[in-house]
UniProtKB/Swiss-Prot annotation:
Residues 4-240 form the ABC transporter domain. Belongs to the ABC transporter superfamily. Transmembrane segments: none annotated. ATP binds at G36, A37, N38, G39, C40, G41, K42, S43. It comes from the Bacteria. This is Fe(3+)-citrate import ATP-binding protein YfmF. Keywords: ATP-binding, Cell membrane, Ion transport, Iron, Iron transport, Membrane, Nucleotide-binding, Translocase, Transport. The complex is composed of one ATP-binding protein (YfmF), two transmembrane proteins (YfmD and YfmE) and a solute-binding protein (YfmC). It comes from Bacillus subtilis (strain 168).
Length: 266
């Protein structure tokens, strides 16, 4: 059993079932990407793994125990979540934002400790934001802003980092900036990263494992080489693709060549 897992997880909004009886395990010390078509439920799974959504049935397990039976503060010491398009109060600086990550470790009305200061400084250094710590968030580029939010998540001091579409609304250079940072945090600092991604080639390039979702169930899971198959692209995305190897690192890549025939007929 991994540090974070789901057992027969069913998730719903009111009476509409979105995820139906899913089992999954997050590989510790690796980068995992949740992929699938729009509306398939991948972000819903991430919310449940982060304890932001209670299951209709089944269990999310954190360190082998039901995550919903653990105190919120204890969960926040083990797992950090960065939602899609997070918002902060106007005028907040990068450093002030980063200190919010220390809240799970503080008692009510207590002052910051030396450990808090050390963790914030480390998080800012690790994300390359130390020189920008006094800037307000609204004065940053898209990539810098996302790095600032990641520094806050790092300041929590957790081994698990969950991100919902961390590259959404960023141009390509800022997308790569964020993905390279997450790769560095995994490689150099041992963080387990779970993220929802839309770009399949980026998912294959940066993730060690992929979990694909189709109609509320896990379609397939494994390494990019295991997941990137012709049936996967046809059934999950309705695409005909040419699957090739990157000339740089031999990771699989897909080149869409058109819609599959059953979709053309519609």
């Amino acid at each position: 059993m991994g540090k974070l897992a789901a057992d027969q997880l069913t998730l719903s909004y009111d009476s509409t079932v979105i995820i139906d009886g899913v089992d999954l395990k997050i590989e510790e010390g690796k980068i995992t990407a949740l992929i699938g078509a729009n509306g398939c439920g991948k972000s819903t799974i991430l919310k449940s793994l982060a304890r932001l959504m209670a299951p209709k049935s089944g269990t999310v397990l954190l360190e082998g125990k039901d995550i919903h039976r653990q105190p919120s503060k204890e969960v926040a010491k083990k797992l950090a979540i960065l939602p899609q398009s997070p918002q902060a109060p106007e005028g907040l600086t990068v450093e002030e934002l980063c200190y919010f990550g220390r809240h799970p470790h503080k008692k009510l009305l207590s002052k910051h400790t030396q450990e808090d200061h050390d963790m914030v400084e480390w998080a800012l250094e690790a994300t390359g934001m130390i020189e920008l710590k006094d800037r307000t968030l609204d004065a940053l580029s898209g990539g810098q802003r996302q790095r600032a939010w990641i520094s806050m998540a790092l300041a929590q001091g957790t081994d698990l980092l969950l991100l919902d579409e961390p590259t959404t609304y960023l141009d390509i250079s800022h997308q790569i900036e964020v993905l390279e940072l997450l790769k560095k945090l995994n490689r150099d600092h041992g963080r387990t990263v779970v993220m929802v991604l839309h770009d399949l080639n980026q998912a294959a390039q940066y993730a060690d494992y992929l979990i694909s979702v189709l109609d509320g169930k896990i379609y397939n899971a494994g390494t990019p080489e295991d997941v990137f198959t012709q049936p996967f692209f046809r059934e999950v995305f309705g695409l005909e693709c040419c699957i090739m190897r990157s000339p740089i690192d031999q990771k699989p890549m897909c080149l869409p060549t058109g819609l599959c025939p059953k979709l053309r007929a519609k």
